[in-house]
């Protein structure tokens, strides 16, 4: 009996740029053989706004409000890196109290970032309920930010060259500790609901596996790198701000799959709580109301309570602050990985060159590699595990 010859042709499918699971205006041109992915080409640039060129035409004080719009889930991190670069270039020393306040804001932002990753990621793989839980917790972080900076999600405009815009308000540290006490059991609740859920584990275990050597060769960072067995965290490696004062551990896993990346982010939320608690207890001068009372009761103006480390800003930088001649690259660990700034000054109020390294752009580059051989139904789970925000990818 003669057999009919069957012939299959690859099919090209466009995901995005306005797909509900795209995490922004990202377009994936996917080539399929049946249900198997044989090629993937990410198309980026839909949200390009020229943030680097804007930086080169603004003073630092003018530019800080812009940067939180790059990654709306990590606004504090971008504010920090934008002021860290000229600080290091000009050798400006930040008071210890201001450094502690910065750490508090950064770690709250890390928790908020991971929460905003967790909800949509679980929705992508079919678990809708936790999506509503994460906004309950984020609301408390928003309240803390609003009390300290006046804004909630973006445009906090809180970091300054030499410190922060203002000291913490009365009762803020107490409210922050209350949040830690309230949020710690919520992480346990997430773990009971998700971590050992057989449906969830079956859905994402073994997906998007990245080996240790691959993670290093592709210049991955953050949870993407640590989930592949590399214990690399810039808070430990570079010891910026005052992270050396705290006891905490680097969260890492060895499997390198979507499930390992989930585990790393959950562990990081626990470690961030540990850092926040220590910072609230160890901040020089204690709560603002106590610090002001001590200053009023101290007649000796040379007392350490009036010293540099008890201030919230080292020096009021003038709007005409000139960035010194020279160049350097500075970096920090955000919720997504390493973000950095290469700055080149020429003794003018605006930088001559301002290059931004976004963590999620570098992490996104490995997507075509790990999608090859995967099923079409797994594309969204693998993409979601990377954690990209297109505002910072495109800049």
Swiss-Prot record:
Keyword Mitochondrion: no
Broad class of the protein's primary localization: membrane
EC assignment: 7.1.1.-
Pfam families per record: Complex1_49kDa
Annotated Gene Ontology cellular component terms: plasma membrane-derived thylakoid membrane
Membrane found in the keyword field: yes
Reaction equation(s) it catalyzes: a plastoquinone + NADH + (n+1) H(+)(in) = a plastoquinol + NAD(+) + n H(+)(out); a plastoquinone + NADPH + (n+1) H(+)(in) = a plastoquinol + NADP(+) + n H(+)(out)
Family named by the database record: Belongs to the complex I 49 kDa subunit family.
Protein name: NAD(P)H-quinone oxidoreductase subunit H
Source taxonomy: Bacteria, Bacillati, Cyanobacteriota, Cyanophyceae, Synechococcales
């Amino acid at each position: 009996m003669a057999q009919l010859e069957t012939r299959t042709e690859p099919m090209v499918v466009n995901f995005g740029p306005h797909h509900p699971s795209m995490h922004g205006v990202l377009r994936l041109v996917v080539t399929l053989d049946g249900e198997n992915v044989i090629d993937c080409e990410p198309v980026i640039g839909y949200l390009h706004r020229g943030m680097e060129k804007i930086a080169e035409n603004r003073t630092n004080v003018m530019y800080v409000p812009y940067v939180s719009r790059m990654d709306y889930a990590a606004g504090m991190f971008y504010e920090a890196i934008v002021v860290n670069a000229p600080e290091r270039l000009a050798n400006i020393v930040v008071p210890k109290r201001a450094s502690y306040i910065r750490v508090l804001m950064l770690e709250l932002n890390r928790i908020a970032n991971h929460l905003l990753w967790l909800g949509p990621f679980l929705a992508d793989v079919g678990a809708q309920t936790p999506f509503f839980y994460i906004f309950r917790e984020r609301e408390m972080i928003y309240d803390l930010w609003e009390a300290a900076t006046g804004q909630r999600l973006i445009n906090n405009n809180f970091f300054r060259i030499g410190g922060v815009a203002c000291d913490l308000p009365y009762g803020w540290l107490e409210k922050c500790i209350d949040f830690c006490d309230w949020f710690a059991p919520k992480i346990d609740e997430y773990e009971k609901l998700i971590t050992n859920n057989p449906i969830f584990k079956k859905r994402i275990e073994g997906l998007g596996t990245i080996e240790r050597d691959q993670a290093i060769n592709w210049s991955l960072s953050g949870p993407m790198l640590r989930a592949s067995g590399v214990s690399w965290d810039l808070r430990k490696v570079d010891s910026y701000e005052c992270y050396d004062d705290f006891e905490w551990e680097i969260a890492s896993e060895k499997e390198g799959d979507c499930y390992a990346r989930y585990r790393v982010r959950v562990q990081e939320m626990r470690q961030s709580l540990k850092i926040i608690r220590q910072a609230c207890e160890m901040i020089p001068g204690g709560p603002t109301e106590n610090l002001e009372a001590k200053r009023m009761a101290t007649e000796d103006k040379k007392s350490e309570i009036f010293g540099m480390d008890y201030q919230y800003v080292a020096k009021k930088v003038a709007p005409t602050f000139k960035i010194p001649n020279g160049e350097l690259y500075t970096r920090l660990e955000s919720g997504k990985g390493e973000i950095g700034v290469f700055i080149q000054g020429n003794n003018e109020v605006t930088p001559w060159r301002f290059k931004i390294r976004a963590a999620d752009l570098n992490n996104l580059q490995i997507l075509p590699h790990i999608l090859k051989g995967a099923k079409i139904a797994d594309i969204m789970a693998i993409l979601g595990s990377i954690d990209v925000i297109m505002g910072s990818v495109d800049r």
